[in-house]
């Protein structure tokens, strides 16, 4: 399955940092930036999430919630989040079911670096799946997509 711009975003419920479960539906009425990343404490993922964290005010200023998803377990996520002081939740998709729903699994079974902007009605308004995960989408591009989604 693969989600495209204009599709209803599939709901999910998975554990995340802070000892709670997160679902897309709990953010109904709010824009969500759903970030899939290959792994905790890897060079590009660390740079990407630190960039989004450092510029988090740009997301919150346009009413968006960032959720970051990878296949690592909660112990790994808690260490990674604490080490870097992330102000958004890291969600644990250990069985890769959510990555499968969004069509982000790469050939080796890891999530590809991907970002989705989901509007307040739950519709995908922006989708980017990296072929090679050596770069990531800049904050300005994502904020532009959020503004365009209205």
Where are these regions (language model features)?
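Chalcogenol-based redox active-site neighborhoods
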Residues: 1-150
């Amino acid at each position: 399955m693969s989600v495209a711009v204009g599709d209803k975003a599939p709901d999910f419920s998975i554990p995340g940092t802070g000892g709670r479960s997160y679902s897309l539906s709990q953010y109904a009425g709010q824009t969500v930036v759903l970030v899939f990343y290959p792994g905790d404490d890897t060079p590009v993922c660390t740079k990407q999430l630190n960039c989004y964290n450092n510029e988090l005010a740009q997301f919150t200023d346009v009413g968006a919630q960032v959720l970051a998803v990878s296949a690592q377990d909660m112990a790994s996520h808690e260490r990674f989040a604490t080490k870097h002081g992330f102000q958004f939740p890291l969600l644990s998709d250990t069985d890769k079911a959510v990555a499968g729903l969004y069509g982000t699994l790469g050939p080796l079974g890891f999530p590809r670096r991907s970002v989705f902007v989901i509007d307040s009605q739950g519709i995908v308004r922006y989708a980017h799946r990296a072929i090679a995960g050596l770069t990531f989408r800049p904050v300005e591009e994502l904020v532009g997509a959020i503004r365009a989604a209205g």
